[in-house]
Amino acid sequence: MDKFQSKFTRFGFISICFGSIALVLLISHCSTSFFDYSFQKFKFSFPEETELRRNVYTSSSGEENRVVVDSRHVSQQILTVRSTNSTLQSKPEKLNRRNLVEQGLAKARASILEASSNVNTTLFKSDLPNSEIYRNPSALYRSYLEMEKRFKVYVYEEGEPPLVHDGPCKSVYAVEGRFITEMEKRRTKFRTYDPNQAYVYFLPFSVTWLVRYLYEGNSDAKPLKTFVSDYIRLVSTNHPFWNRTNGADHFMLTCHDWGPLTSQANRDLFNTSIRVMCNANSSEGFNPTKDVTLPEIKLYGGEVDHKLRLSKTLSASPRPYLGFFAGGVHGPVRPILLKHWKQRDLDMPVYEYLPKHLNYYDFMRSSKFCFCPSGYEVASPRVIEAIYSECIPVILSVNFVLPFTDVLRWETFSVLVDVSEIPRLKEILMSISNEKYEWLKSNLRYVRRHFELNDPPQRFDAFHLTLHSIWLRRLNLKLT
């Protein structure tokens, strides 16, 4: 019995040993499989140390300074990016989405170039009924369709109203606030909340509100520049997109006269980014190959003046005056106009200050031509008001890049007069035949919709043509 128990004990001990070894191997295999799966599932693309050392901008003094991230703070930077940047995605997914954007741009370019040589007007006749006012209506139509199909804008969410995500929707700078509002209301199909699907990135600060809330009388633009510089530093720290292109696929939008000055807060914003501005003065750094002219549209209570609204009586209004102007004497051009024509000719009433008993818009509706001289700045709502009143705009300006010149032929609905020719202004206008005048006026009626702000926006209106101008800059394509 003792001998049998001894054999059984040895057999049991050996069995336990083999069983333990098998169990350990099984657990090891399962654990390895689990961790392999875990690493595959949670594999992230962290920023390289060299990437974190890229230059960023700060502006504690209101000017641009370059700061290099110290290696001791690399870990902290990674943690910050991981915890605050919702745009961090797995590396393959990032690459695929960015590739899709670039592939979309390439396909759009090819499609537009193919359409540019197409002379078949039936394709776009219903949307662009008057082909004469466009540089290349076929290319414009195809480009617009490609924009509707592909174009996506990412709006940075950093910042608080009213300086960011808000803007004026009334008065002379209304177009600035209306654009910001349309992008922020989430009504437009062009906004995306996935930055990796975006074609461009919008910096939604309002220069008009910066001037209103930060500017102090008899000072300078330093507080505005400081804010803009700090804002760009914030978004470039929270997201990788600004540093990826030095801001080339980013845009700001403003109608305030200080827009160009404020954009100097950051070198890349001024030189590389798309600046959408009413004050499009080429002598002040406006570059039409990358920047966009924003039409200056004055709104009263959110609408244009009732006398400028489209109506049958507007088109039938008699036009007893050859030309008209009323405005203050400032800037280099207006003094020349007033010197030669102020109260000189009854056919061309020119006032420095319009008498109170007379109505400005009544004069516009009663004149064949409306003089649009630049003031301190090149832009003026007078150009758009002339279009609304069907009064042929006479552009008297130096270095002013007119709105939507990439698609519109301004010579088909306005008269461009060199400043040196102002003394001959009446002679020039009198030389325009009645047939040509009626042609110009007819074209004004067709082009009007491109300068209207609608609520909600309508196809081919000012909001959408502004987006289209940005789209063209992203395509790096010129429609001719």
Swiss-Prot record:
It is found in: Golgi apparatus membrane. Residues 1-10 are cytoplasmic. Keywords: Cell wall biogenesis/degradation, Glycoprotein, Glycosyltransferase, Golgi apparatus, Membrane, Signal-anchor, Transferase, Transmembrane, Transmembrane helix. One of its GO terms (molecular function) is glycosyltransferase activity. It is a single-pass type II membrane protein. The keyword Cell wall biogenesis/degradation applies. GO terms for biological process: cell wall organization; protein glycosylation. Pfam families: Exostosin_GT47. The keyword Lipoprotein does not apply. Residues 32-480 are lumenal. One of its GO terms (cellular component) is Golgi membrane. Disruption phenotype: No visible phenotype. The chain crosses the membrane at residues 11-31. Glycans are attached at residues 85, 120, 243, 271, 281. Its EC number is 2.4.-.-. Its main location: Golgi. PANTHER family: EXOSTOSIN HEPARAN SULFATE GLYCOSYLTRANSFERASE -RELATED, OS04G0109900 PROTEIN. Belongs to the glycosyltransferase 47 family. May be involved in cell wall biosynthesis. This is Probable glycosyltransferase At5g25310.
